[in-house]
Amino acid sequence: MVNTTIKTTKSQEVFAAAQNLMPGGVSSPVRAFKSVGGQPIVFDRVKGAYIWDVDGNQYIDYVGTWGPAICGHAHPEVIAALHEALEKGTSFGAPSTLENVLAEMVIDAVPSIEMVRFVNSGTEACMGVLRLMRAFTNRDKIIKFEGCYHGHADTFLVKAGSGVATLGLPDSPGVPKAATSTTLTAPYNDLESVKALFEENRDEIAGVILEPVVGNAGFIAPDAGFLEGLRELTHEYGALLVFDEVMTGFRIAYGGAQEKFGVTPDLTTLGKVIGGGLPVGAYGGRRDIMSMVAPAGPVYQAGTLSGNPLAMTAGIKTLELLQKPGTYDYLERITKKLADGLLQIAKETGHTACGGQISAMFGLFFTSGPVHNYEDAKKSDTAKFGRFHRGMLERGVYLAPSQFEAGFTSFAHTEEDIDQTLAIARDVMSSL
């Protein structure tokens, strides 16, 4: 087992210097450990299920670059494909055959997607789909759910879960009220609230967007009938249904949450896994809707590095690896063992906890639960989670540094990794 005391002298030095160079010392807020306390770890390299910091400490990683690393870090086949692609250049700024290959793979995999547009991030994908849904319906208002995060575009920064720290409307200074005035919010898993919003705003709502499985308020699964109910309501009121599958796409099933639950939206956003660890995003859906995107139609969207050959190459190889027989059965088995084990250990060591998993995505809340929505999630003992996170980190397990983030496994994780993680969790929970 990893030592219970790690030395992080170099991490502290690097982070101290970073704070003079970048706001908060990071390029994305959650990395600063504000939610869990203590100094963040500065990492040096990754391989498989493991990550090493600048002090040489090794950790079992359950963050997975916040989702993309479903094959494990630096998979040799992905790296080899990237080496070959690099010889041809890093970016063309023009069409390439690689875009066709990945587009065909995405269309074949995801039930809702008949055409796809590649972008550079999940935020870009959600921005593009927002403009498209409004243009197609000629309506301005949208419904999103409390705790669901759809990137940092102004319209979406309303009750955006882990993406922001407050519950204000809007959630960030610098976002004018006008930018969020057309954003309606409802509690996740609450169909009656959604129906009420439709009734109050008849013929004004362009669509409903949601994470079909919430990952940015912690792990929250949809109640039975919730996704089906949204599909029925959007049909009834002439609105579009959009699944933000940036996190769940190719992770909880090869065809994403829509394959897993058998509910097909009109539009879908993707990211993370489809880039194999490189910056990427995509949005796609019905051909009649996607045909409105420029240059085929009037809805403008563009990007200098969109569809760049490196991201396309990594995405193609990652999806090829995921197609191997037994991959998702293995991910389900090891992740269930981890999630069930954490709950059992919490019970045996006297801690109130709830949580669960779907395929390679999991979560743990220090609250009695069940957690159906963001309000339930906020009842968690975040101080206890912070101590749990620090204890796990000091013993060589890297969890997401926030109670309100899902965890991720990969097919690089072994049964031994899970066993070691659970043994460490027992040690930590016994000392909380």
Swiss-Prot record:
Positions bearing N6-(pyridoxal phosphate)lysine: 272
Catalytic reactions of this protein: (S)-4-amino-5-oxopentanoate = 5-aminolevulinate
CC terms in the record's Gene Ontology section: cytoplasm
Domain of life: Bacteria
Intracellular or extracellular location(s): Cytoplasm
CC cofactor: pyridoxal 5'-phosphate
Name of the protein this chain belongs to: Glutamate-1-semialdehyde 2,1-aminomutase
Organism the protein comes from: Nostoc punctiforme (strain ATCC 29133 / PCC 73102)
